[in-house]
């Protein structure tokens, strides 16, 4: 399912998503949404929670619903500079959890059967079946592939790096990639960190701060 580009109301969207000329890109994002609708393409919207929208979960959620978006994803946009300082666009400590709590209250129970929020769906799946549907809740990372614009295949959209290139969609089949040693070794990295790192969240921290280019 493709990821649609329109994730926030205009004032929030244009805070960080600017064109090369410095103008906001919200209008273009809306046009992209209409192209998908015109061709009857189901789509998902992945919303980054940043310092711009960290205090406005209800507004973001209601905006997406008003745009007819039924499949929502929300992830925290946390990045640090070379000195370990949180970048200005990253949400403040504690704001991500507060955002999710308020988002859940806006979603449940009124729209829980109509609107899919991937994180909440995965928590429910984990509770009912023991099987999560999102990578951070799993014990390993071999869940999907990413295909770049040139056909190159990588194990994850957060790990698009030359040394992790698995092949190209034009000459490689996914079945062979699924069993490739490089893919399996990379996917077991989370479990290896969990076995060797100290407690108190070190697994998440080490994996989250691994070099990535996506």
Show which residues each predicted segment covers:
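A cytosolic small-molecule/anion-sensing beta-strand core signal
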Residues: 149
